């Protein structure tokens, strides 16, 4: 991620290669898994999958159709679980359950009721987000929904575990600097790659709530379903004065963090990036 979108990677033939925030640091594909019982399916949801990608996984594994999963999610009773209290009252959220579908390995009956499938994912998240974590969020002056939103950005930005808490510090520092927007490229991709594909007639509305080059502060909600490492990083950011960072999108995924824009540009140049 290149905060302020200031840099692009230069290739050997002097063309630009833009950063793909979905590029994994480890294997992040949710594949079909063979089970001994033909009536069940074991499904692994990787960290960082969106609600829509989870729906594809369910269809690929015969659990339920993608369309039925999305429909059930969009009409889900948000009063069913206490952990959803924040999102129930949130404004301008496109996918209310985004961020609350915990990434893990599950076993489902094939041709399941999609609402029952969603129940299991949300219930697992509720069990993992402990009272201590809720208290920590409150001590930071943040709601569970806000912490999850930060965690989802961390999940999409970080290439290595060490980068998570540093990225977390950058996000909170920018949030606390009232005149600065987050300007995270991954939120733009969520608008164009998820919201616009699902709701093309609503993208002009939602881009003002999710595109952090446009909106002030956090997007309206999470942009993926983060894992525990990113959630913990959102709850325990490093103590820094950093406002910018650049990450090499190729191994070993080296990164540079800075407190000033000029230093950020220097870091981009040193790492082989060029200002737009």
Predicted regions and their residues:
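C-terminal motif of bacterial Sec signal peptides marking the signal peptidase cleavage site
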Residues: 4-6
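N-terminal, intrinsically disordered, polar/charged segments of Gram-positive cell-envelope systems
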Residues: 9-44
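Glycine-rich loop/hinge motif
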Residues: 36-63, 136-144
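Bacterial extracytoplasmic/cell-wall-associated proteins, especially those involved in peptidoglycan
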Residues: 62-64, 78-276
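Extended intrinsically disordered, low-complexity coil regions enriched in Ser, Thr, Gly, Ala
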Residues: 63-74
């Amino acid at each position: 991620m290149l905060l302020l979108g200031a840099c692009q990677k230069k290739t050997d033939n002097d063309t630009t290669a833009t950063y793909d925030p979905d590029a994994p640091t480890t294997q992040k594909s949710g594949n079909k898994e063979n089970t001994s019982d033909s009536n069940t399916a074991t499904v692994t949801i990787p960290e960082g999958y969106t609600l829509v990608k989870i729906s594809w996984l369910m269809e690929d594994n015969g659990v339920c159709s993608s369309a039925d999963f999305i429909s059930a999610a969009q009409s889900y009773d948000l009063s069913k679980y206490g952990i959803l209290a924040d999102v129930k009252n949130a404004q301008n959220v496109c996918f209310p359950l985004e961020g609350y579908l915990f990434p893990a390995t599950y076993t489902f009956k094939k041709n399941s009721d999609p609402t029952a499938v969603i129940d299991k994912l949300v219930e697992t998240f509720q069990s993992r987000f402990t009272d201590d974590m809720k208290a920590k969020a409150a001590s930071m002056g943040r709601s569970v929904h806000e912490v999850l939103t930060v965690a989802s950005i961390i999940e999409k930005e970080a290439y290595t575990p060490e980068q998570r808490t540093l990225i977390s510090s950058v996000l909170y520092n920018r949030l606390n600097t009232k005149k600065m927007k987050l300007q995270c490229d991954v939120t733009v991709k969520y608008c164009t790659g998820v919201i616009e594909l699902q709701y093309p007639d609503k993208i002009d509305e939602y881009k003002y709530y999710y595109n952090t080059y446009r909106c002030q502060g956090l997007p309206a909600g999470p942009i993926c379903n983060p894992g525990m490492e990113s959630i913990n990083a959102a709850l325990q950011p490093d103590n820094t004065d950093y406002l910018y960072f650049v990450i090499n999108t190729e191994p070993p995924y080296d990164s540079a963090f800075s407190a000033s824009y000029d230093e950020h540009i220097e870091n981009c140049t040193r790492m082989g990036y060029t200002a737009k």
